[in-house]
Amino acid sequence: RERCYITKENSNQFPQLVKFIEELRSAEVHKKIGSLIGRDLSNSFVRLEVICDREGFWLKPHCDIKEKLMSSIVFVNPHGESENLGTDFYDEKLNKVKTVPYKNNYGYFFTSGPNTWHGMEKKEIKKERRCIQINYVTFATDWQVKN
């Protein structure tokens, strides 16, 4: 499992992702997303993480911390991995109710809460399961939103 947060320190290695972060920071975008999820994002920070999971990876069902105002994943599937490798969502009794398909350039977003259980059961990963995780958070990152 490899993970890399995009920071000002490593931003020169990820110019396209920095452009994406700048869009997410813009008042127009964060206000629109805030209206969709019913949250005020005007004092938040963007956190973007590049994720590369390999064989053996799994993530137990959990709810995100309250400091994550919005969680989002965009799947990047250049190796034709199984669509079954998407995120699993669970009910309050931890019964799996939905797997979001792991398709290239496909994703989802949601807000944190007491019944937002998600994770990934252990599944066969042939090469890599890549995705980009985007969060609006209450704690400081290098990318405060603009107002």
Q: Positions of the model-derived regions?
A:
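Short amphipathic alpha-helical segments, especially helix-boundary/capping motifs
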Residues: 5-11, 32-33, 46-50, 93-95, ...
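Short secondary-structure capping micro-motifs at structural edges
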Residues: 17-20, 57-61
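A short coil-to-beta-strand element that immediately follows conserved catalytic motifs
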Residues: 38-49, 83
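Catalytic core of Fe(II)/2-oxoglutarate
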Residues: 51, 56-57, 63-68, 78-147
